[in-house]
Structure formats: C-alpha cells, structure tokens
Amino acid sequence: MYSMITFDHIHLAFDGRKILNDLSFEVKRGEKVVVLAKSGSGKSSLFSLILGFLEPDEGRVFFDGRLVDEKSVWEIRKKIAYIDQDISLGNGKIPDLLDFVLKLKTNIHLDGSRKQLQELLQYFEFDEEVVKKDIESLSGGERQRLAIIIAVLLQRDVFLLDEVTSALDKQLKKKVADFFIAREDWTCLVISHDPVWLENPAVKIFKLEEGKWKP
C-alpha cells in the first residue's frame, strides 16, 4: 500500500499557541485511521491542512504523492469527501439534490446510479417519508447520513470524517462504521471517540497530545 496522506514535520500555531509540533505521519491507501484528541488540540486542523484551507508554518503535506499547495489544491479537493457533525447541504428538496448529484455522474449509466442510490437509501434507513422532506428539516443524523450517500455517489475514495456518527443511535453508528471499514480501497481519516470505530480491529488509532502523537 502506498501513502495517500502524508504529514512531513508539520508545525502549526495560532496566536502564539503551538497546535501541531513537528508532526509526521502517513495514512496509506485503504487504511482506516481514527484520531483521538481533546477539544482544541488541533485535530480539526489536520483536515484543514489536507484540504488546503490552512498552510503549515513549517513542513509539508502530501496527498496521493502531490504536495498540497495553491497549484494542486483544487484537483485534490475533488478526490476527497469531508463530512462533519454539522454538515450543511443547503436548502430545497432532497429528491432535487439527489437528482443533481446523479447528473454529475456522467461516466456511469444513469440506471445503475439510480439503483445504487436506492440501495444506499435503504442501507442508511431513509424511508419514503424522509426522502420527501425539505433538506432544512432534516435532523443532524439524517444530514450526516445523506452527506455520506452523496459522497459515495460522487465516487470519492478518500473520506475525512469529523464526528460523523455523533448524532446517530447505536444501531446506525455501527452501520455507518461497518460501511466504511468494509470498503478495502477507501481511505478514511476519522475524528471520533465512538466505540464503534475504536473497538474495531481493522482501525488504526492515533492519539494527539500537545501537537504530537502519543503511544
């Protein structure tokens, strides 16, 4: 397996406070990695650095072998799905949003895409009544699951997941975690304290303290 995400001696500070301190690590293709850290410890900054929303004070970030910089960042973002606990999906009707997403998939037969959509809706427990809702009326957990469905339809294979199971019940938490972990070719970097991730033997756990990894 080769590296999909690499942090090379990253230093990052805000208002004089060190957030990341000479941090180096890699996430290989297909790995599922969970980051454990206290609030305000810089874990969300990891995602911002990968997506190019932040630049490190020192060091380099690579995605799929490419340096993350202003020249590469737009192409890199097209390959990544970022889903957080407060995901915004805009306004309007769910069917309209899903139709729009399906039309973006120009390289796959539409009938096959619609079949995949129905399978995803069923797996993530979206019944017909929920699908008819306005987007703004969805609960936090429904928005999280819908964002996952959209990311899968758009064929992302690198997922940055920030507390993505936080608003779900125990059964759905497990279904979401199992869904990602079962996809051997998907690379996932996850921020979570949820046991459904931490207790799975297929998941690698990194603990971030004082800007560095701790054993």
What is the role of each PLM region?
Residues I148:
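Hydrophobic anchor residue at the start of the ABC signature
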Residues D134-L138, E142:
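Conserved ABC ATPase signature
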Residues L51:
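Helix-to-loop junction immediately C-terminal to a conserved catalytic motif
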Residues I5-F7, L20-D22:
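Conserved structural motif at the start of ABC-family nucleotide-binding domains
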Residues G92-H109:
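Q-loop/switch helix immediately C-terminal to the Walker
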Residues V152-L153:
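ABC ATPase C-loop
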Residues G59-V68, I76:
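Conserved ABC transporter NBD signature motif
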Residues D134, E163-V164:
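Walker B catalytic motif
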